[in-house]
Amino acid sequence: VELEIGCRFDHVSDVAVPAVAIVEPHSSVRDAILEARWEGDTAEQYEDADGNSCRRLVLPAGASSFSYSATIRVSPEPDEVPCAEETQHLIEDLPSDLLHWLLPSRFCDSDRLADRAWELFGSAPRGVDAVQAVCDWIHDNIAYGVPTVPTTNASEVLAQHGGMCRDFAHLGVTFCRALGIPARYVSGYLPDIGVPKDEFDDFHAWFETWLGARWWTFDARFNVPRIGRVPIGRGR
């Protein structure tokens, strides 16, 4: 399936502002891009340590804008769902390059929520069932559309029982890490294919966990497999 994706940012500032724009598909799906268009000031392109496609630019004083659009090929099938055989590894058996996906981070304070995670999910079977239990609980107990700020972390989302899609993803990552499951945050484009149009026309966020021998997609906001995800950024 060919999909049109894109975004536009309008910016006003009294002074010039150095910035990094991460709005293009992740390097892992770069080969699926059929055509891409960048409109705005010239920007240096680079790939960061997590494989994110970045543009480094300086937004001038006054009003300015930039936009990105692309045609990309996506699978017509919904997200692949892991089977029960995709096991959760013991921490001592994990590859060393996955260990940092277990550590707490700025938005995913798993050290603070470890007790709560084990209280809620400690009795669930390990692996796929545990991650799905996390998604089910967040989907059922965290209200979507509750305003948060860019600095809101998982503990604050849990305390106010509400948030936006990024907050659902942060909380999912946090609970999984507290349970010893490597997890990472993902932002991206998610079209309304085969579902009613979402009233929130924006980027989406979900998370991935390492089970068996690969990363798997989980989405606590919608909590069902979806068609056409295009990852932009992955991180801690």
Feature locations, PLM:
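Intrinsically disordered, low-complexity N-terminal segments that are enriched in acidic
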Residues: V1-E85
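A charged helix-plus-loop insertion that forms the helical arch/lid used to bind
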Residues: T87-I91
